[in-house]
From Swiss-Prot:
This is Ribonuclease H. Its EC number is 3.1.26.4. Signal peptide: none annotated. Keywords: Cytoplasm, Endonuclease, Hydrolase, Magnesium, Metal-binding, Nuclease. Its cofactor is Mg(2+). It comes from Rhodopseudomonas palustris (strain HaA2).
């Protein structure tokens, strides 16, 4: 990330991130999208995987956005995923204390991504916000379109390759 977004940690204004994930079938091909804003500077990110789940794409959107920041930042991160919001807001603390096991002593699903998200958070002060998906929130709709674009582009690559 270059320009003003790399300078984001220097000022009191937060970096604002909007994320979304998409999946065609669950599991199936999926995509993720993120919009990062700092002042008047904006960056769009997207990607996808051939065989995944919606929850993995939601997590990867947040992870990819946070990993794109080049220095410690204050972040307002918006997601329409209750799974991500609840996981990071309450479940992860017990999972870590229990050796990445659930209350039922079962392995945490998507533990690789939860651990990666946990590591990405160490550099930043993140305030998490939940927004209702497909409810007319402009940035959430744009993140959703990026996720669908990531899904489509990945699906086309997997057919060609």
């Amino acid at each position: 990330m270059s320009g003003a977004l790399s300078e984001a940690g220097a000022g009191p204004r937060p970096v604002v991130i909007h994320t979304d994930g998409a999946c065609s079938g669950n599991p199936g091909p999926g995509g993720w999208g993120a919009i990062l804003k700092f002042g008047d500077t904006e960056k769009e990110l997207k990607g996808g995987e051939a065989h995944t789940t919606n929850n993995r794409m939601e997590l990867l959107a947040a992870i990819s956005a946070l990993e794109a920041l080049t220095r410690p930042c204050t972040v307002d991160l918006y997601t329409d995923s209750q799974y991500v919001k609840n996981g990071i807001g309450s479940w992860i603390h017990n999972w870590k204390r229990n050796g990445w096991k659930t209350a039922d002593k079962k392995p945490v699903k998507n533990v690789d991504l939860w651990q990666r998200l946990d590591a990405a958070l160490k550099s930043h002060q993140v305030r998490w916000h939940w927004v209702k998906g497909h409810a007319g929130h402009d940035e959430n709709e744009r993140a959703d379109q990026l996720a669908r674009d990531g899904l489509t582009e990945n699906r086309m690559k997997s057919r060609i390759g």
